[in-house]
């Protein structure tokens, strides 16, 4: 497998966006491009096993580190920070356009996980893609997102780019409380070794700024509004862990699925054992196979 790193300007005008491209060494029978839009706190480098699996089957895998994640560090803040939600959407488009220019005749598939799933759901034009996979997404109240964003904007005036333990607890604390007696981050990964890898990864960013929460809430609010008229003009597959609190333990993601299904019959859903990050948990091989089978159809 060939792994290429590219730096291109982010649409926020400050960040050097880190793009990773994984390609088979033999390119005589390429099947398509798979773009990954990763989750919160993580980065594209965590998808090496995914890339190995799919490059061995003739796909090129690529994706960018979202603003303030991984190697896409922003000079505006040392923690998770986004100045404008739309910049994350535009960066995803920029990454696709960069790679598609090199492989103009290959179909493009889109995978969004968690934070990445909301970026995908707020993308205006999905026509360049043949299919999409949304993992660990949910249905949040647009009204609640507006209320919380207004409160945080007032409380943290002048400190929007600074790390906040309260914001971190607001975003992640409630998930852990649903698994009393379990280790920290069990809501994310059920496997002990996988959790250790995650916790020990120096590129995982846990510090969260109020600005990040506010912009993320805008994305969730937009995704919630879009359920009235989903932008799912392409086939969509939803995947989730049965114990995933982000997906509402199946209730939230199924609400999104039903809205998509009404708009496009070519929509499917499947659940797996596990919590939130099923792509990196002990059941990851069955997830990979499910995705590979879906892309082949």
Predicted regions, residues:
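N-terminal cap/lid segment of alpha/beta-hydrolase-fold proteins
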Residues: 1-26
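Active-site glycine-rich loops that stabilize anionic/oxyanionic intermediates
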Residues: 38-42, 114, 242-243
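Conserved alpha/beta-hydrolase
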Residues: 44-76
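Alpha/beta-hydrolase active-site loop
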Residues: 81-100
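Alpha/beta-hydrolase-fold enzymes
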Residues: 120-203
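Short beta-strand/loop motif that positions the catalytic acidic residue
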Residues: 238-240
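Conserved alpha/beta-hydrolase "acid-adjacent" motif
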Residues: 245-255
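Post-His helix in hydrolase/transferase enzymes
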Residues: 251-252, 279-293
């Amino acid at each position: 497998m060939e792994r290429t790193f590219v730096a291109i300007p982010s649409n926020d005008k400050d960040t050097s966006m880190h793009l990773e491209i994984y390609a088979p060494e033999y390119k005589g029978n390429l099947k398509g491009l798979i773009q990954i839009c990763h989750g919160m706190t993580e980065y594209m480098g965590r998808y090496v096993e995914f890339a190995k699996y799919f490059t061995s089957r003739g796909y090129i895998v690529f994706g960018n580190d979202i603003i303030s994640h991984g190697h896409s560090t922003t000079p505006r803040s040392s923690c998770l920070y986004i100045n404008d939600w739309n910049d994350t959407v535009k960066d995803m488009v920029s990454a696709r356009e960069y790679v598609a220019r090199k492989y103009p005749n290959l179909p493009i598939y889109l995978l969004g996980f968690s934070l990445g799933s909301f970026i995908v759901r707020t993308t205006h034009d999905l026509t360049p893609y043949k299919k999409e996979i949304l993992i660990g997404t949910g249905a949040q109240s647009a009204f609640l997102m507006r209320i919380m964003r207004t409160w945080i904007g007032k409380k943290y005036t002048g400190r929007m780019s600074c790390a906040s333990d309260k914001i971190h607890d607001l975003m992640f604390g409630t998930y852990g409380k649903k698994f009393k007696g379990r280790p920290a981050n069990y809501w994310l990964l059920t496997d002990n070794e996988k959790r250790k890898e995650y916790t020990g990864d120096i590129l995982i960013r846990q510090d969260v700024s109020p600005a990040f929460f506010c912009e993320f809430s805008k994305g969730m609010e937009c995704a919630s509004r879009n359920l009235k008229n989903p932008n799912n003009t392409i086939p969509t597959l939803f995947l989730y862990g049965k114990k995933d609190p982000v997906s509402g333990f199946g209730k939230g993601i199924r609400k999104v699925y039903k809205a998509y299904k009404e708009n496009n019959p070519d929509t499917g859903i499947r659940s797996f054992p596990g919590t939130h990050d099923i792509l990196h948990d002990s059941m990851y091989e069955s997830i990979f196979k499910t995705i590979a089978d879906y892309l082949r159809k």
